[in-house]
C-alpha cells in the first residue's frame, strides 16, 4: 500500500509539473504588459521625451514646418486583448487570420501617453502622419482609420494615414513626408 501511495504521489507530481511546463509562454508576456508599471512608464517616458524634442523644435523655429511620423500597432494602439485571445485559444504565436478578424472588432486601446502627445502636436500645428503595414484586404485603410478615430487621435484622414499592404518597409513614405516637413 505504501508503494502504491508513493507511486500515486509521484504520478501526481509529474502530471502537475508537465502541465506547468506546457503553459503558454505568451501568458507571461501578456501578464507583464497588462500589469507592470514599468510597461506603462516606458510608454510615458518615450512620449514625454518626444514632446520635449517637439518643444525644442518649436522654439527653434527653423526651416520647414514640423511633423511627427508614427507607427500604429504597439506604438499608438495596443492589442493586449488580442494576445489574451490567443492564449485562451491555446495559440502561442501571432496568427494572421485571427489578427485580421480582431482588427475589425476595433478593441484597441491607446498606448499610455500617446493621445496626449499627438494632441499636443496637433494643438501646436505639428502635422501628425500615421504609417502602418497592415493588410486586411480591401478594407485595410478604413479599418486603420476607424481604429485611430475610435481611440481619439487627431488628423486621421487620407492625407495623414498611409497603409502599406505590400511591404513592411516604411522608409520611402517617411522620406516623402520629410521632403515637405
Describe these PLM feature segments.
Residues 6-16:
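Bacterial N-terminal signal peptides
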Residues 19-70:
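Non-catalytic pre-domain segments flanking phosphatase-related domains
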Residues 22-23, 37, 135-181:
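C-terminal cap/substrate-recognition subdomain and adjoining C-terminal extension
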Residues 32-43, 100-108, 130-136, 161-165:
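Second-shell loop/turn segments in exported
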Residues 40, 58-67, 76-109:
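Active-site neighborhood of HAD-like aspartate-dependent phosphohydrolases
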Residues 63-66, 122-129, 155-159, 181:
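Loop/turn elements at helix/coil->beta-strand transitions in domains of secreted/extracellular proteins
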Residues 75-77, 83-84, 126-128, 133-138, ...:
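Solvent-exposed loop/turn segments at secondary-structure junctions
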Residues 96, 100-129, 136-137, 142:
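Short, acidic loop-to-helix structural element flanking the phosphoryl-transfer center
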Amino acid at each position: 500500500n505504501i508503494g502504491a501511495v508513493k507511486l500515486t504521489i509521484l504520478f501526481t507530481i509529474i502530471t502537475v509539473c508537465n502541465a506547468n511546463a506546457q503553459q503558454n509562454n505568451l501568458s507571461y508576456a501578456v501578464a507583464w504588459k497588462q500589469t507592470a508599471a514599468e510597461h506603462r512608464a516606458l510608454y510615458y517616458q518615450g512620449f514625454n521625451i518626444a514632446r520635449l524634442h517637439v518643444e525644442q523644435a518649436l522654439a527653434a523655429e527653423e526651416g520647414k514646418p514640423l511633423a511627427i511620423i508614427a507607427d500604429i500597432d504597439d506604438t499608438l494602439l495596443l492589442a493586449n486583448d488580442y494576445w489574451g485571445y490567443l492564449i485562451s485559444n491555446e495559440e502561442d504565436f501571432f496568427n494572421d487570420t485571427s489578427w485580421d478578424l480582431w482588427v475589425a472588432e476595433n478593441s484597441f486601446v491607446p498606448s499610455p501617453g500617446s493621445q496626449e502627445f499627438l494632441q499636443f502636436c496637433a494643438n501646436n500645428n505639428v502635422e501628425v502622419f500615421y504609417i502602418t503595414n497592415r493588410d486586411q484586404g480591401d478594407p485595410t485603410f478604413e479599418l486603420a482609420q476607424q481604429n485611430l478615430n475610435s481611440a481619439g487621435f487627431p488628423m486621421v484622414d487620407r492625407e495623414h494615414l498611409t497603409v502599406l499592404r505590400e511591404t513592411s518597409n516604411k522608409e520611402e513614405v517617411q522620406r516623402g513626408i520629410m521632403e515637405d516637413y
